[in-house]
Amino acid sequence: MKTIKSNIVKAALGLAVVVSPTFFSSCDDMLDLVPQGTFTDAQLDSTTIEGLLTSAYAGLECHFFGNNESFQGPITNWIFDVRSDDAYKGGGSLSMESNIHDLEVSNLRSDNVCVRDKWRNNFYAIDRVHKAMRAIEGSNVANRESMLGELKTLRAYFYFDLIRVFKNIPYFDETVDDPSSVSPYQYSRDDIFGFIKQDLREAYLAMPEKQQDKGRFNKYVAAAVMAKVCAFTASVNNSQQDWNDVVTYADYVIGSGQYELYPNFLDMSKVEFDNTYESILAIQFAATADNAHYNYPNMLNCTISEGNLYGNGDDFFLGSQNLVNAFRTNDAGLPYLSGNSGDVDNNVNVTGDYQGNVDPRLDFTVGRIGFPFRGHTYTSSWCRAYDIYGEYSGKKGQLAPEDPNMVPGIVPWGASGLNFCLIRYADILLLKAEALIETNKDLGKARELINDVRDKAKRSIDGAYSPVDLDPMRASYKVEPYPAEGWTQDYARRAVRMERRLELAMEGNRWFDLVRWGTVVDVVNKYMQNESSLRTYYEGASMSDDDVYFPIPLDEVDNAANGTYDEPKQ
């Protein structure tokens, strides 16, 4: 069966004509995206149209300039987990990737390259979408409306990613001839969320239930993105209607019968399970001969290893001690719900020799000294800067070195063709559960959905499942479903927030959950204060309300007309 992944590879090898060369050279002003590379009617054949569509999908890779820009401003949003209480920057020193270090300690500046790269990666991706839209709108290609639905879903996702990160952004569609004329303050945030939702409504109606190519968007991808968007606006605006919409669109996904939870938690880190089970919206990475489409955003986040077993690794993106502690469970197999946002007290630290109960998802998420790591034994010598960042190298997104989907000859060793799920089925189940809890409509159903996710974790306790990633003989794994007794709205809210933290840990969700819940400043400040006793680089670090959203990149302000923008729309 064809996949959109194979189409992306073919487009890169044989359809370079579909993207204008000026697209790659015009880097000075990310708002200066005047339409380039128009096509004549004779050029608009089905092959060219497919190439443009595929190029738009490839925008999810965020590989427009080079590997550094993909790493520093990825749509995987790992750098935002570093901004939260879930992760440390990692690497060999504090100064290595210093711009990400600044984000970790909340030293937020408009000239930070992560701010710049996040902005321009998304806007260049949107430009690709608009190129494809203009071509398709002017053609008579078969499945025209469905293709436009795919592109509207992509555009909605890119704008959603931007509006979650930046407080003010310019919004323009494919009909705008000169995007540089659009001020970041022309539309309010509510306006932009409205545009995003309208794209997704239209996309849902236009796309089929199934696509021939695996990984290509169907109507349920649009529904899943809509559920994510509505959960954000529901939380921020305390909107009961938006919570109702979360349930509606989550039910579209659930009722489709096309998605289910992975049989084993480890399956999300296996290429053979790409575009199956939980995968709803994924970046389609590939191990190819030209090394053009491997997992640029994550490749540096691989552990170093004893005796160079894995080859050189940069060991960025390590789980925090606070995150690891969150995986503790009590005698009933339930997490310790000490906070209202999945945050925990650091009174007990889980380490490799910890004797208490833990959720098995801990050892699928991070490496622990003495425990299996993709079939090998993880030791302290695998930690590049143990004294600074500790031991908890991330596992999600990393294959075993023997896996045939690794890209050989790349340093560091982490380059592979493993997809990265931006939205997976467990996320949608938990969003529906959260919506039912917030509206107080069906707490029992919410508990059932949360327990479905916990049951997957329980059945994943299999010490023989390959490649081996946990050790039931060494750790006391215990995870159980929530009982009906004591299941109040307040308790259920704390439970679903903790479940999102545990299930989706180090997948780029935690920061945005804290933002939409309105707890990010309190949670991160408490976290930084606790961390300062363990890691001196947190001493004096703090976050204010002004630090939540990225500022407009300094380059964009400098390049704007007269160096200023119009006053914000209230």
For each feature predicted by the language model, list its residue ranges.
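Membrane-proximal, proline-rich intrinsically disordered regions
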Residues: S26-W78, L334, D555, N559-Q570
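Structural register within alpha-helical repeat arrays
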Residues: L148, R155, M226, T233, ...
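Glycine-rich, aromatic-lined ligand/substrate-binding cores of catalytic
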Residues: Y277, I283-D387, Y425, D442
